[in-house]
C-alpha cells in the first residue's frame, strides 16, 4: 500500500511539473529546468552519504572499538539480507538516528550518543532495524527522485516568474502568476506526503527485521519526547535535514501537510497493529505520559564513561 501511494504521489508530482510547464508555455524551459535540477540532485545522490555524515561530525566505529553496537547492526543486516553497512556514532545529546547512502552496497547508518543513552537494547535494535528497512526499500533513491522533480518545479516557477508572465495577456497572465506561486507549495506538500509514506514503510520493515514492533514503538515514544526537548544544531542550521531522522529533529504537534514524519502517536498505533498481526502484542507505550514528564530524558555527557559497548564512550 505504501509503495502504491508513493507511486501515485510521484505521478502527481510529475503531472504538476508538466502542468506548470504547459501554463508557462513551451517545453524548452521545462526541459532545461528538469535537466539542471536532475544534475544537482544526481550530484547530491552520489555524494549524499559523505555530505550528511560530515555535516553531523559523525565518526565511524567498528567491531574493535564498539563491538556490541556494531554486532547488533551486523545481526540485523544478516536478517534483512543486506550487506553490512558502515556504522557511525554522532556525539550529540539530541537522541536520533538515520540511514544514508545511494544503495544497499554503499549504505551507512548512524546513531547519536543521546539515543544510545536513553534506549535499552531491544529499543536500539528496533531503531536500527527501521534504518536498515530504509536501506532495503531504497528510500534514498525514491526521495532523490522526488527531490529532483520538486526542484525542477521550483526552478521552472522561478523561470516563469521572470520570463513567463510578460509574454501573455489578460487571463493567461493571472493563470501564470497563480501557477508560479502555487506549484512550489503543492510540490512541497506532495514531497512531504511521500516522506511520511516511506516512514510507515520503514516502521513495518523494522518491525519485521527485528521481530520486536513493540520495542520500536517504545523507542519512538522516547525519541520523540527527547528530540522535542533537546536542540538539534544541524536542523536549526538546515531545517530540511529534519527529514533524515527516525523522528523529526524539532518539536511539532500532530500531523500536518508540511510534516516530514507522521505523528508519533499514529506510528505507535500502526506498530500496535503490526504487533497484533505478528502475534507479539504487548502493552503500548504511554506516549502522552512520556510527553508530560519533565526531565525524563537523560543524555550522555561526552566526558562520561560507561561500561556498555552500546555506548561509544564505553571501553567495550
From Swiss-Prot:
Transmembrane regions listed in the UniProt entry: 16-36, 145-165, 174-194
Membrane topology per record: Multi-pass membrane protein
Record-linked InterPro entries: HtpX_protease, Pept_M48_protease_HtpX, Peptidase_M48
Residue stretches in coiled coil: none
Keyword Ribosomal protein: no
Residues reported to bind Zn(2+): 130, 134, 199
Cofactor note: Binds 1 zinc ion per subunit.
Primary residence: membrane
Taxonomic lineage of the native organism: Bacteria, Pseudomonadati, Pseudomonadota, Alphaproteobacteria, Sphingomonadales
A GO term, aspect molecular function: zinc ion binding
Compartment annotation: Cell inner membrane
Protein name: Protease HtpX homolog
Active site annotation, chain numbering: 131
Family per similarity comment: Belongs to the peptidase M48B family.
GO cellular component, one term: plasma membrane
GO BP annotation list: proteolysis
Names of required cofactors: Zn(2+)
Organism per entry: Rhizorhabdus wittichii (strain DSM 6014 / CCUG 31198 / JCM 15750 / NBRC 105917 / EY 4224 / RW1) (Sphingomonas wittichii)
